A protein has these predicted regions:
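Bacterial N-terminal signal peptides
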Residues: 9-20
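Positively charged n-region of N-terminal signal peptides that target proteins for export
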Residues: 1-4
């Protein structure tokens, strides 16, 4: 009888512990635990929702790589990269396979709190883009995705201007490292600037 009560007590304790265990939360990492790209069945990208926990690279204000209409308001661009790729860049001066660079666009504000001049970033996200390096998957090794909902990144056609622009002007491996102040010196030290970028700089 005593043994039966012990078994029942152990069973109840196990049940309580199981119910108290935290529910696993959704993660943007893949099954291996790395921040590598994960794709949907139709070839799009599962947007890395926790990208703001990645490495911050740079910000720009009202940047444009060609003539465009005045939007009537200012915009901030923030760039983040997955930690694995960042660490590899520091060692080699270039991006490894499975690199993901996220460009986040936010509205700029000028009137708020005690601010009297200049601009600050608002909470309104206007757009998200992801530049993915997947050598086995994409022609040219890189691809662009855009995400309106922050859930799915839609693959952009290789015919779009962003591909040729990055190939012709990117300082390192089709990426605009020339605008990443903490990485520009690394690329210079490792001698990884593209021929196109060096030619462009020499012509200034």
């Amino acid at each position: 009888m005593k043994r039966a009560w012990i078994l029942i007590s152990l069973w109840v304790l196990a049940l309580v512990l199981a119910l108290a265990a935290p529910t696993p939360q959704a993660s943007t990492t893949n099954e291996s635990g790395s921040n590598s790209p994960v794709y949907t069945a139709d070839g799009n990208l599962k947007f890395p929702a926790q990208y703001r926990e990645w490495i911050y690279v740079t910000s720009g204000v009202d940047m444009s790589y060609g003539p465009g209409a005045n939007m009537g308001h200012s915009m901030f661009d923030n760039v983040f990269v997955n930690p694995e790729a960042y660490k590899a860049f520091l060692q080699t001066g270039t991006w490894p396979d499975k690199t993901m660079l996220v460009l986040e666009e936010r509205m700029a504000g000028s009137k708020g709190s005690i601010n009297k001049n200049g601009h600050f970033q608002t909470g309104e996200v206007m757009g998200r883009e992801v530049h993915v390096k997947d050598e086995a998957r994409f022609k040219g090794k890189w691809a662009f995705f855009t995400s309106d909902d922050g859930v799915t990144g839609k693959l952009l056609s290789q015919e779009m201007d962003c591909y040729s622009c990055h190939a012709q002007h990117g300082a390192v491996d089709t990426t605009f490292v020339q605008f990443y102040p903490t990485l520009l010196g690394v690329a210079k030290k490792k001698n990884t600037f593209s021929a196109a970028y060096l030619k462009e700089e020499a012509g200034k």
